[in-house]
């Protein structure tokens, strides 16, 4: 019996040794994964691109009458804050902002819905490229902010999905299975 157990352990060890080792995650890979799953990769939740896909300007402007934001306002808010923090990350001068967060929602223009969708995709893509190009020192100093950006995006994407469900414009087949 001891011989069988020994041979089994030895065989499994050889098999494990013969396999290529899994690369351990890095700070960069973790941050990129968080950014991508809130942008265009469906993992634990629906990404932004899927959340806004196929919406008309009218659907994006719809409000529930209870003081909540529209999908367009939420998308506009996401574009603003992602761009604001990306600008800082790149070391560029930030856009003049008086600190009133309400204006990041209220500047939404129904006529510009398609442009807002494109801007959201673009800024999320730019974040991924910027993190990919950044060195470890920069990522270490920014990791908390970037992680919060991913969380912030996921929070508002969840709101977008909820609003779509309320208005009847959400296709459950696009959800996470």
Language model: regions and residue ranges:
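Bacterial Sec-dependent N-terminal signal peptides
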Residues: 1-23
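Extreme N-terminal tail/first-helix region
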Residues: 19-37
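Short, contiguous alpha-helical
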Residues: 24, 36-45, 49-52, 59-101, ...
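Amphipathic, well-packed alpha-helical segments that form the structural scaffold of globular domains
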Residues: 49, 53-57, 125-128, 132
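Acidic/histidine-rich alpha-helical segments that form the ligand environment
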Residues: 104-137, 147
């Amino acid at each position: 019996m001891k011989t069988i157990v020994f041979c089994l352990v030895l065989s499994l060890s050889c098999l494990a040794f013969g396999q290529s080792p899994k690369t351990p995650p890095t700070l960069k890979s973790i941050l990129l994964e968080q950014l991508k799953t809130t942008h265009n990769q469906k993992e634990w939740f629906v990404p932004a691109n899927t959340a806004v896909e196929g919406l008309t300007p009218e659907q994006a402007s719809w409000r529930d009458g209870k003081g909540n934001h529209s999908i367009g306002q939420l998308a506009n808010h996401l574009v603003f804050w992602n761009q604001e923090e990306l600008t800082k990350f790149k070391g560029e001068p930030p856009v003049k902002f008086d600190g009133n967060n309400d204006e990041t929602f209220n500047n939404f223009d129904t006529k510009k819905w398609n442009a807002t969708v494109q801007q959201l995709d673009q800024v999320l893509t730019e974040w991924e490229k910027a993190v990919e190009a950044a060195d470890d020192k920069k990522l270490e100093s920014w990791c908390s902010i970037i992680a919060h950006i991913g969380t912030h995006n996921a929070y508002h994407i969840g709101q977008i999905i909820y609003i779509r469900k309320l208005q009847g414009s959400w296709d459950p087949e696009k959800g996470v299975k």
